[in-house]
Amino acid sequence: MKLDLEGRIALVTGSSQGIGAAIAAGLARAGAMVGVNGRDAERLDKGIEQLRAEVPDGRFVAIAADVATEEGAARAVDALPTADILVNNLGVFEPRPALEITDDEWRRYFEINVLAAVRLTRAYLPRMMARGWGRVLYISSDSAVVIPPEMIHYGMTKTALLAVSRGFAKEAAGSGVTVNSVIAGPTHTEGVEEFVRELVGADLPWDEAQGLFMRDHRPQSLLRRLIEPEEIAHLVVYLSSPLASATTGGALRADGGYVDSVLP
């Protein structure tokens, strides 16, 4: 079984670090040329340097743009007019007491976590459909299904992505383009590590902090540990490949068994 993406062009939003960077590396290993996106040019350059160290024969191009804005999304599309694979990974999260989330915060989360993906899909999906092949993916979260009380604004956006993904899959029906979302479970990224330490204690050894977090805040996990970014990337690369040609309109889980359901 070969995940052959040779000759394909991919754009991964928010990919200078974390899950996005792992996805970019995985797609490059499978043969795709990858547009690596971030809004901070210096951080983006460092991210690409790290990716090239990980995947020496990988092909990466920097797409410096804040795709959470209308202007930034247009800049990204201008920089990479053709994409066979679009991975909408960009997202922000921060714990906030539910009744203290302001209108501006609700709008900001929707702009970054949802509208950025919608804008890019509107730009790339018609071009993919015209060519008769493409992959559009949305990185959602277990928080879309199991809404965390400390992050309901984040959970709302990730639920919205499931609806967006299913809707665009219907729009692309019969075109040769597949559209899916990935429900990622609690994942070990730099941002999540900071979040964990805020909740359980900044001075604890990491293994102990992770164990306490999973026990007290994510006890539903059957994995009983945080997922590594590469474990999310494996599913994304498969869904981006020709092997996943019959999978569309789905919300596929890489959640470590966190979502308590027998359904996918």
PLM segments and residue spans:
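Active-site helix of classical SDR
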Residues: T121, T157, S165
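Conserved glycine-rich cofactor-binding loop
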Residues: I9, S16-Q17
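Short, small/polar-rich loop/turn modules that mediate ligand/substrate recognition or access, typified
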Residues: A173, T178, T247-G249
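Residue(s) in the substrate-gating loop at a strand-loop-helix junction
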Residues: S141
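Alpha-helical segment proximal to the catalytic Tyr-Lys
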Residues: P126, K170-E171
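Short C-terminal tail/terminal secondary-structure segment
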Residues: M1-E6, V146, V236-V237, T248-P264
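Substrate-binding pocket helix/loop in short-chain dehydrogenase/reductase
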Residues: P97-A98, E105-F110, H217
